[in-house]
Amino acid sequence: MGFPGVWMTESESLVYRVVPKCACSTIGQIMYYSDHGTYFDGDIHDSTQGLHKWGQDDSQKVIEAAVLDRRGITFTCVRNPYARLLSSFFDKIAGIQRNGRRYRGNLVPQLMQKYGIEVGSPEDNFDFDQIRSFRRFLLFARDTIRWRRPMDPDIHWSAMSGHISTFITNGGRYDQIFFTETFNDGMQKVLDAAETPVRVDVGAVPRFNESEGHGPKRAHKVSEYFDDLSRHLIWEIYKRDFQLFRYDFDDPDNKMPTGDIDLAEVHAKLGR
C-alpha cells in the first residue's frame, strides 16, 4: 500500500500527509522553501522536483524508508468540515480551474443533468442560487461516499479521517496535527520541531490559494447553506471528522475547534 498522498522535503526534515482543501498549497510551498530558500515557481501541486511526492515513482522508496524509520517531523492539517465542503463546492464545482476548464471535464454538466445543479458562468458573473445548488451538490457528494455512484468519492470532499487513516494503517505515525483555522501557530510549531536547512517564519509567508479568483464568492454565511436535511447528511458523511478533530457540529458558523486533538485517540481509532 505504501503512503499515498504524502509529500516530503528532500532533506527528510518534514513529512506531510496531504488533506485536500486544508491549506495544502501553502504547506507545500513552505516545505519547498524550507529546503531551498525560495518558493516553487507555480502551483506546488505541479512540481516534479525539489519535493518528494508519493505520486513520483523515484520518491516512493525514499518516503517509505523515512516514514518507517521515523525520520523528520510527520504532520497533517485539518479544517472545519462545513467550511471545507463549501470550499470544495465553490472551487471544484462552481469555479473554473487554472487551465480554463471545468473540473474533471464533464462532471459539472453531468451534475446539472442528474442533480439539477446550477453554477453560472464567468459571462453572467456566476449568477445562480448558491444555497439550492450547494444542497444538491451535497446529495451528490453523499451518493459518491455512501454508494460510490455515480462515481467514486473525490479526494476534495471525502472525509479527512479517511485521508489521514491511510498513513496510520500503513505504518506511519503523526507527530503533530494542527488546524487550518489557527494555521500560523500550528505550522510554526511543526517547523520549530524540525531541523530544516532554511528557517521559515510562517508569519512572513504569502498564502498560496490556487483556487482564489477563479469562481464565485460565497454570498451567505455558512449556516444558511445547511438546513436540517443538509446537516443530517453532513453528520452521516463527516461524523468522525467532527468528533476526532473537535469541530462544532451544532453551530455551522463556529469555524473554530472546540478543543485540542488527542493524537493517541486519532491513532487508535484510525489505525484499526
What are these regions (language model features)?
Residues 1-272:
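Membrane-interface amphipathic segments in extracytoplasmic regions
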